[in-house]
């Protein structure tokens, strides 16, 4: 403190000495000399003042941007753009929605209108317009009608460097009058600096890119898109005039909220163009009466395609941005991703189509009448039930108590539960809910009914991946992003029998082959129950509740998803070894070292499973999922490139044999994936394999499908695990989930643009692999005596395959066909068409766990 006092005392002493010297200059001088000295002194004082402001002398004026720290490299908040693999802009990340453009990307009429209206001497001044300043001062003094004197360059300085906020925080800036003087001084200084560094063309382009047009539209590119759904280059003269007119007051002259004001202001701008020779009088007369036609839509962060995928990309880049010093929402990055918009649309359409049917089945199954929601007893049964099919008490109440609105009711009525109960259970009010046909709809119902309505929707996830590159080509996180933002692709759920992939892969690693046999018989063992904290006897059963007692080839056991064989293999190979194999292939979720892991008891997510199945399709080479291929900064420099390396994590022989097992799901008699033929049976140039999965009580239904160049996976289930179907006929993976993949594959492989995904798995490349390892007789259960006419556990609609493993369509004798036709029954061709139309209705009699 003493040092500061001494400094000010020294400065005061020097100032007094200067005043004494300065006073001596006037003594004995002529009047004109005194006048010249006074003028020179004012000029010098003003220059010294500007210098003091620029260097923030004694912290009195606040910081200013230097040439190297700001002027040469101006930083503005720019939206980061995200692009698909097929070159489409699919969304943005932004705080201020701004995307810069080049001078040549804007119609010349916009710049003409801008200069004619905002700064007519723009091309003549050096950042400050003395004529404009004196004219504004004269109007203020004589007419008490002040007008703006800021040049375009000064406005750019204000927009780009925020001189009215962060650069006016000096000590003197706290004094209102001095604050205004300092702000204008800084604008002048920065404007002159900008004029010395940039050309007029660069300055006016930077201004067009930084100015605020209202409605969260920053810059000419975003404004043109928001108000007219066009590009800056395609703006008409009238549209350009509307946007320029808004700059005086974005709210008052907004064409959407104040159309009359905007209309008058537009014509003023057009007249200014006539005055300066940039628009003919005849053209003005044509334009002045034209109405303003808007195509208005405010762009939000969540607008665009692949919304769940874009959120996944944001999470993926969070750490990278932090490490590299970028802000995803302000740095103006261009992010190039692996997603394909055409495949994404196929995936979203497939999910919506199948889930609409699943939801209809679920509603009928539980007697839920959604159209009557909020009107009496619209739910016939409560579907939230435990593993013993008992209704879970207070289930909906528990969900409600976690919601903000319920917490607000408790805070408002802390000692009045009747009021809370009224507003929760009795007060009917408009609520926005989801509808498959209309998207978001408004219904009148109570808060309790709205929770029931939204909770009883079934959900899904889907992902498609290239096994050779890890590139994610399609990503569906749920049925509707606006209502459910939680991404089910990365949600962890029990995989059921789809986890058997790792059990059998480890078996192949340890020398077994698809033609080796294991007995399907009763098995029990002592295991530790984590819920009860005690040892208990675990008796895994097959889906049909019985055991054949036969020795079954592994290819048949895998295709039919026989649990007893999988559990036996798990014990034989070792659960720890199976966990190691799963981790190598792409599973990062924690896995429990317990015998039930062989049946998929530990939670994993769909992306991990797709990655692991891709390892098999890629001949044992693992590639991490790739979402982003490269990132380019706002200067055009590539600052990130996605990974391209893969690693051989399982032997080629094991991968090849697993490819045969997966294909067996479709080719083996009784294979649980056979209904996929109803979707891909026409594509004989491509081989497919699949694995279904369904957990206890049908809470989770899965399907994983592999082909040589494309792997897809899907999950279907309730938001809560207690919401599910009660029967395998409706709830198993082959019924609920397989069609999602089927519809997608049908669209992709039927599209000539994706011919590159067609193909067959490679022939064996290892001399150690012989045909007798994977080609052998399939298991056929022995006929049972004293049973029903059709034994659902033994009977499976037979699909006959040719030498290439493709289904053979049997011919119906002509006489028989004619007879059926005459009797009014469907012919073979009609049946085939019907089967194609509803492939989900093919009978599947194995309830795959």
Residue ranges with predicted function:
Residues 113-115, 273, 347, 469-470, ...:
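Active-site SXXK
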């Amino acid at each position: 403190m003493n040092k500061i006092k001494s400094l000010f005392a020294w400065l005061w002493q020097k100032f007094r000495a200067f005043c004494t010297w300065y006073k001596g200059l006037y003594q004995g001088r002529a009047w004109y000399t005194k006048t010249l000295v006074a003028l020179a002194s004012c000029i010098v004082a003003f220059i010294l003042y500007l210098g003091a402001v620029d260097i923030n002398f004694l912290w009195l004026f606040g910081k200013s941007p230097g040439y190297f720290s700001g002027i040469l490299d101006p930083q503005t908040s720019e939206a980061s753009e995200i692009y698909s693999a097929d070159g489409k802009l699919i969304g943005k990340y932004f705080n201020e929605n701004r995307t810069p453009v080049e001078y040549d990307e804007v119609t010349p009429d916009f710049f003409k209108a801008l200069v004619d209206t905002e700064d007519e001497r723009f091309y003549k001044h050096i950042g400050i317009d003395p004529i404009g300043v004196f004219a504004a001062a004269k109007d203020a003094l004589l007419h008490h009608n002040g007008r703006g004197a800021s040049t375009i360059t000064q406005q750019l300085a204000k927009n780009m460097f925020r001189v009215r906020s962060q650069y006016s925080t000096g000590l003197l800036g706290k004094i209102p009058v001095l604050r205004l003087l300092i702000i204008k001084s800084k604008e002048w200084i920065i404007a002159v600096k900008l004029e010395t560094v940039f050309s007029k063309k660069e300055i006016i382009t930077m201004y067009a890119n930084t100015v605020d047009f209202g409605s969260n539209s920053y810059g000419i590119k975003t404004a043109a898109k928001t108000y007219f759904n066009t590009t800056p280059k395609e703006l008409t003269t009238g549209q350009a005039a509307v946007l320029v007119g808004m700059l005086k007051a974005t709210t008052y002259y907004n064409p959407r909220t104040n159309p009359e004001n905007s209309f008058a202001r537009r014509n003023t701008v057009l007249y200014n163009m006539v005055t300066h020779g940039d628009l003919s009088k005849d053209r003005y007369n044509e334009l002045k009466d034209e109405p303003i036609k808007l195509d208005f839509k405010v762009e939000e962060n969540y607008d665009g395609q692949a919304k769940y995928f874009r959120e996944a990309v944001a999470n993926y880049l969070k750490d990278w941005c932090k490490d590299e010093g970028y802000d995803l929402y302000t740095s103006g990055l261009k992010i190039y991703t692996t997603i394909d918009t055409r495949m994404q649309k196929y995936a979203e359409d497939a999910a919506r189509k199948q889930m609409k049917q699943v939801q209809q089945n679920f509603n009928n199954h539980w007697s839920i009448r959604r159209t009557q929601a909020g009107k009496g007893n619209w739910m016939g049964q409560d579907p939230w039930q435990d593993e013993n099919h008992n209704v879970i008490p207070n289930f909906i109440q528990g969900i409600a108590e976690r919601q903000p609105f319920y917490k607000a009711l408790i805070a408002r009525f802390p000692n009045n539960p009747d009021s809370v109960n009224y507003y929760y259970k009795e007060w009917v009010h408009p609520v926005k809910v989801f509808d498959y046909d209309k998207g978001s709809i408004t219904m009148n119902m109570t808060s309790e009914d709205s929770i029931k309505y939204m909770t009883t929707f079934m959900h899904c996830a889907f992902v498609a991946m290239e096994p050779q590159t890890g590139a994610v080509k399609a990503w569906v996180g749920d049925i509707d992003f606006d209502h459910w933002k939680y991404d089910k692709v990365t949600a962890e759920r029990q995989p059921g029998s789809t986890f058997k992939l790792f059990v059998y892969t480890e078996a192949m690693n340890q020398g077994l082959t698809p033609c080796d046999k294991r007995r399907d018989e009763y098995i029990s063992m002592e295991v530790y129950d984590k819920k009860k904290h005690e040892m208990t006897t675990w008796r895994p059963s097959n889906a049909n509740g019985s055991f054949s007692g036969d020795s079954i080839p592994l290819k048949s056991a895998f295709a039919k998803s026989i649990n007893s064989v999988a559990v036996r293999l798990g014990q034989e190979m070792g659960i720890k070894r199976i966990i190691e194999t799963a981790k190598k292939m792409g599973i990062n979720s924690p896995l429990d070292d317990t015998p039930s892991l062989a049946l998929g008891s530990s939670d994993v997510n769909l992306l991990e499973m797709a990655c692991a199945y891709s390892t098999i399709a890629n001949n044992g080479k693992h590639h991490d999922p790739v979402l982003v291929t490269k990132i380019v900064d706002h200067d055009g420099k590539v600052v990130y490139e996605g990974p391209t390396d893969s690693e051989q994590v399982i032997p080629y022989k094991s991968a090849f044999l697993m490819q045969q097992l997966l294909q067996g799901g479709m080719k083996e008699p009784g294979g649980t994936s056979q209904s996929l033929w109803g979707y891909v049976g026409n594509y004989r140039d491509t081989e497919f394999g699949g694995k279904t999965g369904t957990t206890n009580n049908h809470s989770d239904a899965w399907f994983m499908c592999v082909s040589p160049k494309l792997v897809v996976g899907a999950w279907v289930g309730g938001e809560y695990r207690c919401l599910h179907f009660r029967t395998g006929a409706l709830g198993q993976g082959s019924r609920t989930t397989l069609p999602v993949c089927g519809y997608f594959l049908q669209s992709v492989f039927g599209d000539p643009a994706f011919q590159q995904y067609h193909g067959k798995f490679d022939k064996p490349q290892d001399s150690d692999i012989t045909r007798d390892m994977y080609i052998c007789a399939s298991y056929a259960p022995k006929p049972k005596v004293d049973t029903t006419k059709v034994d659902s556990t033994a009977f499976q609609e037979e699909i006959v395959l040719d030498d290439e493993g493709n289904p053979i369509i049997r011919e119906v004798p002509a006489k028989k066909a004619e007879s059926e036709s005459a009797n009014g029954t469907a012919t073979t061709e009609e049946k085939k068409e019907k089967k194609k139309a509803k492939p989900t209705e093919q009978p599947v009699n194995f309830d795959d766990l």
